[in-house]
């Protein structure tokens, strides 16, 4: 499981050090793709396979299903950590997420997310200010 929040920097080649706590969980490699809210999602290969199977079974007749499948699958790339524990984030994904030098890695259980540091700060402030409303809506779902 991936949990925690970590600040990292991208180097000039677009590489980012994976938090030490997460490296062993990635094993031989991982999948990075476009995420929601303009961040990137990083999945273990096993988690990715589970998600991909669900995605390819969505109905092709629904435009929203097709759009979401395209967003997730067409943007995906295999990544493998180098000896220093860094992964290379492809240019098109750095551009999608607006990544500059400073990034935040947020563990969200079955994946981790990579955010531009300023975008994360804004997202977190917005979410924290609405936490009571969010909690109320989740309680309606039994959480």
Task: Annotate each predicted stretch with a short phrase.
Residues 1-7, 12, 22-79, 83, ...:
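Flexible "stalk/tail and boundary" regions
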């Amino acid at each position: 499981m991936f949990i925690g929040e970590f600040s990292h920097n991208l180097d000039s080649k677009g590489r980012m050090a994976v938090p030490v706590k997460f490296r062993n969980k990635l094993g031989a490699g991982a999948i990075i793709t476009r995420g929601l809210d303009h961040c990137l999602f990083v999945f273990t290969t096993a988690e990715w396979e589970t998600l991909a199977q669900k995605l390819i079974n969505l109905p092709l007749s629904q435009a929203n299903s097709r759009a979401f499948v395209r967003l997730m699958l067409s943007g995906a790339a295999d990544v493998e950590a180098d000896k220093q524990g860094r992964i290379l984030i492809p240019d098109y994904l750095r551009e999608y997420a607006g990544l500059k030098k400073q990034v935040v890695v947020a563990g969200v259980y079955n994946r981790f997310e990579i955010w531009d540091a300023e975008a994360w700060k804004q997202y977190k402030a917005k979410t924290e200010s609405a936490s009571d409303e969010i909690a109320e809506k989740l309680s309606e779902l039994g959480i």
